[in-house]
Amino acid sequence: ISREMVDYGSAITAPTVAKEGYTFGGWEADVPSTMPAKDTTFTAKWTVNQYTITFNTDGGNKIAPITQDFGTAVESPADPTREGYTFAGWDGTIPATMPAKDSTLKAQWDINQYTLTFKKNDEEVISSEKYDYGHVFHENEMAQDPDSVGYSFMGWSPELPTKMPAEDFTTTAQWTINSYKISFYGDLDNKLFHEVTVEYGSDLEDIINE
């Protein structure tokens, strides 16, 4: 509010006015070019401005921008989500009320770690290590091909990923049972008289009695 004493008939120049968060829309009554013969009050007209808060989720799910009047209460959106990461907040504070400017907030993320486990069978763990999500595996990080008496290693199931997924991953060795040849020789002439191929672990007594 400003007051000024002006002589009757003197030229009047309306002042320049500004108000944070508002656009000046003129005066409620026309300002005369010269001072009338009475005290006069002129009231400014204002239009509230709208401003926008934009959310850069940096790879997370999209969050709609907030556009509303200056000074109105701002409701914080739900935290964004991003595969393989944990939301760690914004790089600035979401205001309680809309400020008199546009602003952009960027999401901050902590990368998650997940466990890669190699199992020899349903019970025996060969190795178990944690890796960052998206970590690209190198050959030296893979478990060596295991061995097991009487069995041949056939690979891993499920197939090993090239990168660490956004979940713990367990793969189990697959085996094929080995077969072996048993040869029977005569005790006098050492002559081969019978051969049989059997799987590892078969009951030898049954084989001998055949």
Label the model's feature ranges.
Residues 1-210:
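Secondary-structure capping and domain/repeat boundary segments
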